[in-house]
Amino acid sequence: MNFMELLLFVLSMLLAVAFLTVAERKTLGYMQRRVGPNAVGYYGVLMAMADAAKLLLKEMILPTHADKFMLIMSPMMTLMSALLCWAMIPFGPGITIMDSNYGFMLALAMGSVGVFGSLFAGWAGNSKYSTIGSMRSTAQLISYELVLTTVILICMLLTGTMNTSRYVELQESMWLVVPLLPLSLMWFMGCVAECARPPFDNVEAESELVSGHMTEYSSSMFVLFFLSEYASMLFYSTLTAILFFGGGTGLILGLKANFFAFTYIWVRAATPRVRYDKLIAMCWIVFLPLLFALALFMPSLIYIMDGYTFME
């Protein structure tokens, strides 16, 4: 993939994120029995452009006692982390920016760097709301990264590969969600928590922390955090489609990823926020023990399924 193709991919990703926000607002509107955006452009589709113009034209205010260098670098670090994850995604046979034998682990490793962005943003803002939000963010993201990593390791035990392209090929006969349905549900909940999306949006709980680690941000710096959140949501939706639903090429993969992205929105509209201590306890007391037990059971499952599924 040359530089122009890479640049086109990044711009396409940012454009997809922009229109995902419009889709979210329209979906929430219909679920709450109202219209949603409908004035800017045909059916409100240009609302994303209007929002972007509004945010970028605002003044960027840096607090007097803040660490200005870290305050500016943190959102850039978070967005870069969210975009680098896409290097491991197979969009078709041979269409991968970086085809590695450790693709899944590298994707999660790149995504985990975003934790530092939110941590540094909370510290640099010199605000109690930012600090509490960054501490919540760090604890929540690190906890649920363990859940996602354990789920991927269990899937790798069953398929015998960490290469994302090879992984898609092995699901041609049967999607992995069939034998591992409980695991896929834990994976999805872990993805929602990892993206800090409702009902697990304790990182920026408006009623408690104003806007969490983003409290002191405005204008273009806030846009970078906003883009990174939705880019991560699209990435984990695509990874879910690959990990449990056979992936696909081009349009098929896009349709599957869009379905899971809309599932995030439906969950947001239908569920109240989970209390923070309950969220962390669910990870350490419920999910991780269950996943470790399933990892111990996996050799028996491989023996039972040997001969007519993924094992070759």
UniProtKB/Swiss-Prot annotation:
Cell compartments where the protein resides: Mitochondrion inner membrane
Keyword Coiled coil in record: no
Stored PROSITE patterns: COMPLEX1_ND1_1, COMPLEX1_ND1_2
One of the protein's GO biological processes: aerobic respiration
The organism's place on the tree of life at top rank: Eukaryota
Pfam families: NADHdh
Keywords per UniProt: Electron transport, Membrane, Mitochondrion, Mitochondrion inner membrane, NAD, Respiratory chain, Translocase, Transmembrane, Transmembrane helix, Transport, Ubiquinone
Primary localization class, coarse: mitochondrion
TM stretches of this protein: 3-23, 37-57, 69-89, 104-124, 141-161, 173-193, 233-253, 279-299
Topology of this chain in the membrane: Multi-pass membrane protein
InterPro entries to which the protein is assigned, alphabetical: NADH_UbQ_OxRdtase_su1/FPO, NADH_UbQ_OxRdtase_su1_CS
GO terms, molecular function: NADH dehydrogenase (ubiquinone) activity
Catalytic function, reaction form: a ubiquinone + NADH + 5 H(+)(in) = a ubiquinol + NAD(+) + 4 H(+)(out)
Gene Ontology CC: one annotated term: mitochondrial inner membrane
Enzymatic class: translocase
Function field: Core subunit of the mitochondrial membrane respiratory chain NADH dehydrogenase (Complex I) that is believed to belong to the minimal assembly required for catalysis. Complex I functions in the transfer of electrons from NADH to the respiratory chain. The immediate electron acceptor for the enzyme is believed to be ubiquinone.
Family: Belongs to the complex I subunit 1 family.
Protein name: NADH-ubiquinone oxidoreductase chain 1
Name of the coding gene: ND1
